[in-house]
């Protein structure tokens, strides 16, 4: 069997995965707080025919060896946690993070998840929740007779209640940072989960220790650049076509051999 057939096959598999990732990025171009991904690849093991530095004669050595590669494989998908644009909504419950950090979210199983999507809502009890209904940590309850909600840059939440002139302090929204954001596991629903690779969560007041600040009435949009993804798609398509051509050429060579 001609090795180039299998080598090209690994190239096809790799480019298909790359296309899947690009398609997912483009599909989430309108998803609040979405962070685009990129595929990371590495070459497979090599077959060493001649080692560099071995003797070519009694007095000379080979300056370079002869190694034949066996293809490529995907290693990981890396999240690119760059800042997305802030889109003005004027909704009092919308909060965007300008800078680093994540909001904390309580999951039904008791675990904690993290999100950049600050398009919050109120449930039937007046509690601040995500669009999927998951409560924000710490628990924030907005009184039903509130006339104005204020979320400061440092995360302090206060409201003005009917019949009163002084604002009532409700709580503090802190942000969570990680040593390695790319190590977070994506759960869907704009949520991430801590892993061993991400490191432990570090809770910080917005605006302190390099953490981002909060902007009320804004949401962070996806950081997907459509033009860049389309260029990546064209490159991936061309790479797929080239690997397909390699398979066709190898097949033609094999046919020639079988006719001898």
From Swiss-Prot:
Biological process according to GO: bacterial-type flagellum-dependent swarming motility
Location(s) in or outside the cell: Bacterial flagellum basal body
Record keywords, A-Z: Bacterial flagellum
InterPro entries documented for this protein: Flag_bb_rod_N, Flagellar_basal_body_rod_CS, Flagellar_FlgE/F/G, Flg_bb/hook_C_dom, FlgE/F/G-like, FlgG_G_neg, LlgE_F_G-like_D1
Record bears the keyword Cell membrane: no
Highest taxon listed in the record's lineage: Bacteria
Pfam families: Flg_bb_rod, Flg_bbr_C, LlgE_F_G_D1
GO cellular component: bacterial-type flagellum basal body, distal rod
Keyword presence, Iron: no
SUPFAM superfamilies named in the record: Flagellar hook protein flgE
Family stated for the protein in its record: Belongs to the flagella basal body rod proteins family.
Subunit architecture: The basal body constitutes a major portion of the flagellar organelle and consists of four rings (L,P,S, and M) mounted on a central rod. The rod consists of about 26 subunits of FlgG in the distal portion, and FlgB, FlgC and FlgF are thought to build up the proximal portion of the rod with about 6 subunits each.
Name of the featured protein: Flagellar basal-body rod protein FlgG
Designated gene of the protein: flgG
């Amino acid at each position: 069997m001609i090795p180039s057939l299998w080598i090209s096959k690994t190239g096809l598999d790799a480019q298909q995965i790359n296309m899947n990732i690009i398609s997912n990025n483009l599909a989430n171009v309108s998803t609040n707080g979405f962070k685009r991904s990129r595929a990371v690849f590495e070459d497979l093991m090599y077959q060493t025919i001649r080692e560099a530095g071995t003797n070519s004669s009694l007095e000379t050595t080979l300056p370079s060896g002869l190694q034949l590669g066996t293809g490529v494989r995907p290693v990981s998908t890396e999240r690119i946690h760059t800042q997305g644009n802030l889109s003005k909504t004027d909704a009092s419950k919308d909060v965007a993070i300008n800078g680093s950090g994540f909001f904390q979210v309580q999951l039904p199983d008791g675990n904690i998840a993290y999100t950049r999507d600050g398009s919050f809502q109120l449930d039937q009890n007046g509690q601040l929740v995500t669009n999927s209904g998951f409560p924000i940590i710490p628990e924030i309850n907005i009184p039903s007779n509130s006339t104005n909600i204020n979320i400061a840059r440092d995360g302090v939440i206060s409201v003005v209640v009917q019949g009163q002139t002084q604002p009532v302090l409700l709580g503090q929204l802190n942000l969570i940072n990680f040593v390695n954001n790319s190590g977070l596991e994506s759960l869907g629903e704009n949520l991430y989960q801590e892993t061993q690779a991400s490191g432990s969560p570090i809770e910080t007041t917005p605006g302190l220790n390099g953490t981002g600040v909060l902007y009320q009435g804004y949401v962070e949009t996806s950081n997907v650049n459509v033009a860049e993804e389309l260029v990546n798609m064209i490159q991936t398509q061309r790479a797929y076509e080239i690997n397909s051509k390699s398979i066709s050429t190898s097949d033609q060579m094999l046919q020639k051999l079988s006719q001898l």
